[in-house]
Structures are given as structure tokens and as C-alpha cells.
UniProtKB/Swiss-Prot annotation:
The record marks 103 as: Transition state stabilizer. GO terms for cellular component: cytosol. PANTHER family: CATALASE-PEROXIDASE, HYDROPEROXIDASE I, BIFUNCTIONAL CATALASE-PEROXIDASE. Its cofactor is heme b. SUPFAM superfamilies: Heme-dependent peroxidases (SSF48113). The keyword Metal-binding applies. Bifunctional enzyme with both catalase and broad-spectrum peroxidase activity. Its EC number is 1.11.1.21. This is Catalase-peroxidase 2. Binds 1 heme b (iron(II)-protoporphyrin IX) group per dimer. It comes from Shewanella oneidensis (strain ATCC 700550 / JCM 31522 / CIP 106686 / LMG 19005 / NCIMB 14063 / MR-1). It is an enzyme of class 1 (oxidoreductase). The active site is at residue 107. Pfam families: peroxidase.
Length: 741
């Protein structure tokens, strides 16, 4: 008996301990974090997100290499077969998952926004909070991704979730008779939720992001918390088509879409599928995936009404289809938009939508699951907007008369939607990449000449140093060029030398007057040097600008007593003004750049927070950011040559003086009574003014974590480490956009 009883008691004890443990874990209060006690403390977390340690594939994994081993046609064949393999646990509308997967791909890519380049399909962020649990717009997309798991499981590390979701959207379109423009792979998956400012609201679908004039705050891309773009029922649920059109134009514009692309996307996308609002969500639908019980295994929005799916499905609360054949590419969306007069009605869930006034339309649309049931077509307020707005009306009527133009416009707009955050074409992978270069891809001419060798590089560097340009001028210019890069959507950077073109040449942070002088001298050096080269070898101005900064850093290090070589890899090319969309590049202009101690009135955050934002855009770590700020101050690289933070008596020399003097207790700091936002460092004994600084400078002595790093570089043995680390971080920024190396 004892032999049998002990395991039974052990099992019972285990079950009880698990049950009690679960209850105790729920009851235990969460520890109070530092952010509660010191809410104003500068948050460095953005510089630590998606660390390589979080990647289960490890540091040696190269996604591009893995992707290029795929048989892409075989992958697409598998995805296509999945389209019509309806699963009992989530049956396909009309027997085809195509429209469902289009919505998944669209809503994965559609959170992209131009002002900070965040959002988009790269990273596969739809898997993580908050996107995986956004109400209305992303309801049920957890099922779409779960349907794709067999495909992801089969191809594993060769196919990221980011690429799979977009590719599935493409295959869905093609399986329903639409010819897509192409597909480029290369979206590397993230392993945690990206830190994005989605808004300050504390309730879903709340709206506190408009000012008194009704203008949407930057960098927001959606009108309400938890939406992709606009409320389909109208602004804040008010069914006003013209007001809806205004919001559509703004939000789609913030995703880099013009009016024609916007119309093509809405009309093309709503050609397929249906909306789901069979019941009142408040009465039927359970918690979202993030809030659902552990037993739901990442699925949410459990529907307790009827079957819980099929004809009882609830997502947005709107109900119905836009065409009579929602799994085929047709012109019915536009045809019916103008054929019928549309009147307001409500879905079974009580949401405002529109149906034809003509009762003869009542049976045009088949039910998605019940063969003996038919319905009238529907439109959202955001659909009626395409007819009510004069500009959208001109485009929709033109598309209606010219189906081939509409089809091409949708194909190109869909391609742009799903690839906008992937960066330049050089990053695209796979056999389906279209040959055409598109202006929104920020094209750069292909390399068409032999590159200069090491001997040439040394000779060119000497020519630059002999040009009369100073170390600070060369460093400022190289930094201004390369630091325009942002890793959120892979735009900007030194390649292309767009710093000499509109609009970058006139950005205030770049000190246009000095920049023009420096570029003129560098262009002369380039011209003379290319004229001296034998054969067809050439060097671009983009390379000359970067090399100029690099040899300046070498010279500054040598004057500090350290001989070091700054790596340089030629191969950049020069873009033309024709290849540069001025309006598109305008959003890259920095409102602040703490590395240059530049801060404008257009900044949306404090100076220190804007520094973190800029460092995050450059994919820098905390130590990299710290060493770059200290080094650039020593090099006298501030915008417009301002002296704040230049804590050295030998500016232009790459010393660790910034850290030594910042940490010097003989200096007492006080707010300046002469200039707002500036601090004065006085000798603690005599009161004599020694230095001036901005909050960006002083944060490295005030913030406990940043001070800890600063102490490393300010120590007596810190000079060599400082120079070595500065050169590594400098080289990282200079090559941030070199996707070819």
C-alpha cells in the first residue's frame, strides 16, 4: 500500500501546489519599479531592445543567406494550397482564406508611418502586443497567423514571419485572379515588441491625438488608439463621408500614399472578402490574445455566440461584403459604388454602415457560409468617402472607366504598402523582385566602375587633408551625411550623397552655409583626383565625404597621441536630384540631433529624449551613443559650431576630455539666467565660468547608468579605450546604409 500511496500523494500534492501557486501568483502584488518613483528619469530601454541575446538563432545567423536557399515557387505553391483547405476550428469564408490573408498582410504592413519610419511588416510585429490585440482592426488575425503555422513550421529559419505574412498576401491575391507587381523578401523577425509611441490614450478607440484645429499629432498614423488608419464608420463614429475623406487623406498620406494610391488600395482591397459583425461584440466576444487565459494558447476574442465562427463571426462589428464574388478580382466594388444610391443602416452588431436604397440589390451577395442565404452589398462610410470627395471621385470614376489602369495602380500601391519599410531595393531578396526602380525606394545608381584601392584611398585622404578644410568641418559634414540614416525603415544615410541635394542641403541642422563651402572643396578634390586616376577607376562624392570624416578622425586621434586606422570601404554612388523625392525626404529632417547638440522648436520630446530617439534610429547601444557624444564634442562637431558641451581646451583633438571634465568635481553646474535650456559650469571655488552645456551634455553625468559608462571613458586608463570605441561606433554609423557589404 505504501508503494502505491506515495505516488498518489505526490501527484495530489503537486496538483494542489500548482493550484495554490497559481492563486498566490495572481494575488501577489507586483514590485514597484524605478519608473514609478522617478517617472521623469530618462528611459534607455529603446537602446536595448531586440538585443542579439534575445535571438534564438544566435549571432552567426544570417537571414538573407537562409532565405536565398528557399525554393520560392515551392513555398508559394504550399501557401496557395492552404488557401482552400478550410479548417473546422476557423472555417474559411466562401471556402477561401484569400481575403482573410490579405487583411492580415495589409494590417501587418499598414501600421508604417513616415515621420519616424516605425511600424510596417518588417520584424513580424503583428505577433506581439499591442498589435496582436488591437480591437476592431486586428480582431481574429491571430487565427490567420495560426493557419499559417504549418508553412512557417515547414520552412523554419529560412522564412521569417514578416516575409511569410506579406508573401501570403501576394499569393492570396494571385490565387483570386489578380496579377501582383512583385515580392521582395528580407524582413528579419524581431523577438520582442518594438517600443513605439502608438499614442497616450488609456482606452481602446479613444482619441486624444488631435489638437484644437483637428490636426493629428506627429508621428501618429491612425486617428484613434487601436486603429490602423481611420474609423470605417466615420471620424469618431460619426458617418460623415466628407469628414472621413479628410481623415483618409491625412492618415494614408502619413503612410506615404498619395490620393491615387489611397483610392487604389481601398477599392482594390475591398474588392475581396467581407466584414464580420453577426452579433454585438460586447455580448459575445471575449478577451483579446494578450488578456486571454493561458489555456487559449495565444488566441483571443473567443466568441460564445452561435458557432463562434462562420456565420456567427464577429470582428469589426460591421457586416457584409462589397461584391457578389468576394474571392475573385472584379470591378464590382467601383461599379456598385456608382450604380447604387447608398443609405445608412446598421449591422446586426449595431454599427453604422451603408446599403443600396434599391431593394432589388437585397439578394446580390451570397452568404459566406450558408448556401441558401443572400444579402445586399455594403459599404463603409470610408468607402462612400471615395464617391463624396471631389478628388477621390475623379480618381474612382477614371478607374471605373479604365480597369487596366486601376489594376496596375492597385498592384503598385499594394507593392508599396507591403515593401515601404523594407528600405532600398538593394535589401530585396528573391526571384520575384521587380526590375523597375521606383522613386519611393530612394534609388541610387548601380556601381558602374572599378573601385579605388588602398593606395588610392591613402592618396585621396591626403588630398582631402590638404584641401584647407578643418577637422571639425570634415567631421560635421560626414556625420550630417551618414547620420540621416534611420534603421526603422532603412532610409537615409551617406550612400547617394544626397546631402548635396534638396532638401538635405538646406536642413538647419546641417548648417547650410558651411556645408556648401565644404562640399564645394570636396567636389573639387573628387574631380581632380578622378582626373588623375588611370583607367576607368572613379570615386564618388559620397565616398569622398565619408573618407573626409574618417581621415579627420585619424588626424584628431594622432594629435591625441594615438595612431589608429579608421576602416573605409569604397563603393558608394551619387544619386541625382531626379532620383530624390523632395517631399519624401523632408520627413527625415532632424528636429533634434543630440550628437551635434542641435535642438529645434519642432522637437516633440525633451533634448535628452530626442538624443535617445536619434540613437535608436541609428541602431546604437548605450555605450556607442555615449562614446560618440563625447568624441563629437571633443572634435568640436556641434551644429553651427556652438560651444556647448565642448569640455576641452584643445577642440578638434580626439581626447576623452568631455568625460574627464564632466566628471570633475571642481566644477559646479547651475542653470543659466541668460539663455533658457543652457547650463553654466563654474569653478567651485572661484566662481569663474569654465563651460556651458545643454541637458544632452549633462545627462551623461546626471543619469546613473550613463554616468557609469562615462566613468569608464573618463578614467585615467580610459583614453585608449575611448578612441578605439569611438572609431568602431563612428564606422558603424558611416556604414549603416551599406547593405552591399
Amino acid at each position: 500500500m505504501k508503494i502505491n500511496t506515495l505516488p498518489t500523494l505526490s501527484a495530489l500534492t503537486l496538483a494542489m501546489s500548482l493550484a495554490l501557486g497559481a492563486g498566490m501568483a495572481t494575488a501577489q502584488e507586483q514590485a514597484t519599479g524605478n519608473q514609478f518613483w522617478w517617472p521623469e528619469k530618462l528611459n534607455l530601454s529603446p537602446l536595448r531592445q531586440n538585443a542579439i541575446e534575445s535571438n534564438p538563432y544566435g549571432s552567426d545567423y544570417r537571414y538573407a543567406e537562409a532565405f536565398n536557399t528557399l525554393d520560392l515557387d515551392a513555398v508559394k505553391k504550399d501557401i496557395k494550397a492552404l488557401m482552400t483547405e478550410s479548417q473546422d476550428w476557423w472555417p474559411a469564408d466562401y471556402g477561401h482564406y484569400g481575403p482573410f490573408f490579405i487583411r492580415m498582410a495589409w494590417h501587418s504592413a499598414g501600421v508604417y508611418r513616415i515621420f519616424d519610419g516605425r511600424g510596417g511588416a518588417a520584424g513580424g510585429q503583428q505577433r506581439f502586443e499591442p498589435l496582436n490585440s488591437w480591437p476592431a482592426d486586428n480582431v481574429s488575425l491571430d487565427k490567420a497567423r495560426r493557419l499559417l503555422w504549418p508553412i512557417k513550421q515547414k520552412y523554419g529559419s529560412k522564412l521569417s514571419w514578416g516575409d511569410l505574412m506579406v508573401l501570403t498576401g501576394n499569393v492570396a491575391l494571385e490565387s483570386m485572379g489578380f496579377k501582383t507587381f512583385g515580392f521582395g523578401g528580407g524582413r528579419v523577425d524581431d523577438w520582442e515588441a518594438e517600443m513605439v509611441n502608438w499614442g497616450s490614450e488609456k482606452a481602446w478607440l479613444d482619441n486624444k491625438r488631435h489638437n484644437g484645429k483637428g490636426e493629428l499629432a506627429k508621428p501618429m498614423g491612425a486617428t484613434q488608439m487601436g486603429l490602423i488608419y481611420v474609423n470605417p464608420e466615420g471620424p469618431n463614429g460619426v458617418p460623415d463621408p466628407l469628414a472621413s475623406a479628410k481623415e483618409i487623406r491625412d492618415t494614408f498620406g502619413r503612410m506615404a500614399m498619395n490620393d491615387e494610391e489611397t483610392v487604389a488600395l481601398i477599392a482594390g482591397g475591398h474588392t475581396f472578402g467581407k466584414a464580420h459583425g453577426a452579433h454585438d461584440p460586447a455580448k459575445c466576444v471575449g478577451a483579446d490574445p494578450a488578456a486571454a487565459g493561458i489555456e487559449e494558447q495565444g488566441l483571443g476574442w473567443k466568441n460564445k455566440c452561435g458557432k463562434g465562427h462562420s456565420e456567427d463571426t464577429v470582428t469589426s462589428g460591421l457586416e457584409g461584403a462589397w461584391s457578389s464574388n468576394p474571392t475573385k478580382w472584379t470591378m464590382e466594388y467601383l461599379t456598385w459604388l456608382y450604380t447604387f444610391d447608398w443609405v445608412q443602416t446598421k449591422s446586426p452588431a449595431g454599427h453604422i454602415q451603408w446599403t443600396p436604397a434599391d431593394g432589388k440589390a437585397a439578394n446580390l451577395v451570397p452568404d459566406a457560409h450558408l448556401p441558401d442565404k443572400r444579402h445586399a452589398p455594403i459599404m463603409f462610410t470610408s468607402d462612400i468617402a471615395l464617391k463624396a470627395d471631389p478628388i477621390y471621385r475623379e480618381i474612382t470614376t477614371r478607374f471605373l472607366k479604365n480597369p487596366q489602369e486601376f489594376e496596375l495602380a492597385f498592384a503598385k500601391a499594394w507593392f508599396k504598402l507591403t515593401h515601404r519599410d523594407l528600405g532600398p531595393k538593394a535589401r530585396y531578396l528573391g526571384a520575384d523582385v521587380p526590375a523597375e526602380a521606383l522613386i519611393w525606394q530612394d534609388p541610387i545608381p548601380a556601381l558602374d566602375h572599378p573601385l579605388i584601392d588602398n593606395a588610392d584611398i591613402k592618396a585621396l585622404g591626403n588630398k582631402i587633408l590638404a584641401s584647407g578644410l578643418t577637422v571639425p568641418e570634415l567631421v560635421r559634414t560626414a556625420w550630417a551625411s551618414a547620420s540621416s540614416f534611420r534603421g526603422t525603415d532603412m532610409r537615409g544615410g551617406a550612400n547617394g550623397a544626397r546631402i548635396r541635394l534638396e532638401p538635405m542641403m538646406n536642413w538647419q541642422a546641417n548648417n547650410p552655409k558651411e556645408l556648401a563651402k565644404v562640399l564645394a572643396k570636396l567636389e573639387k578634390v573628387q574631380k581632380d583626383f578622378n582626373g588623375s586616376l588611370k583607367g576607368s577607376k572613379k570615386v564618388s562624392l559620397a565616398d569622398v565625404i565619408v573618407l573626409g570624416g574618417s581621415v579627420a578622425v585619424e588626424k584628431a586621434a594622432k594629435e591625441a597621441g594615438v595612431v589608429i586606422s579608421v576602416p573605409f570601404t569604397p563603393g558608394r554612388m551619387d544619386a541625382t536630384q531626379v532620383q530624390t523625392d523632395v517631399n519624401s525626404f523632408a520627413v527625415l529632417e532632424p528636429a533634434a540631433d543630440g550628437f551635434r547638440n542641435y535642438y529645434s522648436k519642432d522637437s516633440s520630446l525633451s533634448p535628452a529624449e530626442m538624443l535617445i530617439e536619434r540613437a535608436n534610429m541609428l541602431n546604437l547601444t548605450v555605450p556607442e551613443m555615449t562614446v560618440l557624444v563625447g568624441g563629437l564634442r571633443a572634435l568640436d562637431a556641434n551644429s553651427a559650431g556652438v560651444k556647448h558641451g565642448v569640455f576641452t581646451d584643445k577642440p578638434g583633438v580626439l581626447s576623452n576630455d568631455f568625460f574627464v571634465n564632466l566628471l570633475d568635481m571642481s566644477t559646479k553646474w547651475r542653470k543659466s539666467d541668460k539663455q533658457e535650456g543652457i547650463y553654466e559650469g563654474q569653478d567651485r571655488n572661484s566662481g569663474k565660468l569654465k563651460w556651458t552645456a545643454t541637458p544632452v551634455d549633462l545627462i551623461f553625468g546626471s543619469h546613473s547608468e550613463l554616468r557609469a559608462v562615462s566613468e569608464v571613458y573618463g578614467a585615467q586608463d580610459g583614453q585608449d579605450r575611448f578612441i578605439q570605441d569611438f572609431v568602431k561606433a563612428w564606422n558603424k554609423v558611416m556604414n549603416a546604409d551599406r547593405f552591399d557589404i
